[in-house]
Amino acid sequence: MEFKHKDIIALRDLSKEEIELLISTAENMREVNSRDIKKVPTLRGKTIINLFYESSTRTRTSFEIAGKRLSADTVNIAPSNSSATKGETLADTALNLLAMKPDIIVMRHAVSGSHYFLSKKVGCSIINAGDGAHEHPSQGLLDMLTIKDKFGRLDGLKVAMVGDITHSRVARSNIQGLTKMGSSIFLAGPPTMMPPGVEQLGNVTVCGTMKEAIQDADVVIMLRIQQERQGKTLMPNTREYSRYFGLNPENVKWAKPDAMVMHPGPINRGVEMSSYVVDGNQSHILKQVENGVAVRMAMLYHVCGGGNVE
């Protein structure tokens, strides 16, 4: 199958078959990551600009490593050392970068939908590394790969997501991707952090309690409280939040005995999850990070038209 998209902005835009292709390619890319010399010439001569208007550790570093392992030239730009601090608009920044002839711009931005705007302004490929509360497609893909690693499939699974659903781009990408692949999504969180109409996104059930959501779940994905996106306080305090929506050694038993626990990071230990669960046998958090490099290699590879991976 040929991947025909110039950009990867949202999993909503991709078909089930296209998602399967990206995951399959990522599985193959892991072989490169297991070598002593972790580099192939696939994107030699290509230039990738990582343009991050929001802070990031895992995603930015992972995209940089992914590009370098495919032999691309990678350039990192942060707002603190860009012309954005002098009032330059996103459109002008994009046009100036485009004049330097990059092949791919990987961007993270606080405004939802900013990548669609950027895509209309530039001719190179755009990959969304997170836009506001809209989507985070690479995180959704790496989560699906991590789940598939354990169960060998994605269809027929009960996936619980607990936390700040309203402000979570990870939640939206996972809902879009996992429901297309046949999983059932169960959501739990404070009513102030649950978006109205979220059930319309697919096979989604909003639960009144955390227990209802994670009861007999195959996968439990805990989400961070997005305080930087909340215009006002949406909960009394973190202790109260943890009491009702934190994952601990007792309530993790509500899920299936072989259930996997995941978190997109960064983790607030003692709030979303106790250290016992973070570091426990059911935790696949570091596996998510590991899979992130392979998934982002696959994304870069396909928006550049594919080719041979040697």
UniProtKB/Swiss-Prot annotation:
It holds the Pfam family OTCace_N. It comes from the Bacteria. L-aspartate binds at residues 86, 169, 224. Coiled coil: none annotated. Keywords: Pyrimidine biosynthesis, Transferase. Carbamoyl phosphate binds at residues 58-59, 108, 136, 139, 265-266. GO terms for cellular component: cytosol. Its EC number is 2.1.3.2. One of its GO terms (biological process) is amino acid metabolic process. It is an enzyme of class 2 (transferase). It catalyses: carbamoyl phosphate + L-aspartate = N-carbamoyl-L-aspartate + phosphate + H(+). Pathway: Pyrimidine metabolism; UMP biosynthesis via de novo pathway; (S)-dihydroorotate from bicarbonate: step 2/3. One of its GO terms (molecular function) is aspartate carbamoyltransferase activity. SUPFAM superfamilies: Aspartate/ornithine carbamoyltransferase (SSF53671). The keyword Transferase applies. HAMAP family: Asp_carb_tr. Heterododecamer (2C3:3R2) of six catalytic PyrB chains organized as two trimers (C3), and six regulatory PyrI chains organized as three dimers (R2). Catalyzes the condensation of carbamoyl phosphate and aspartate to form carbamoyl aspartate and inorganic phosphate, the committed step in the de novo pyrimidine nucleotide biosynthesis pathway. Belongs to the aspartate/ornithine carbamoyltransferase superfamily. ATCase family. This is Aspartate carbamoyltransferase catalytic subunit. The gene is pyrB.
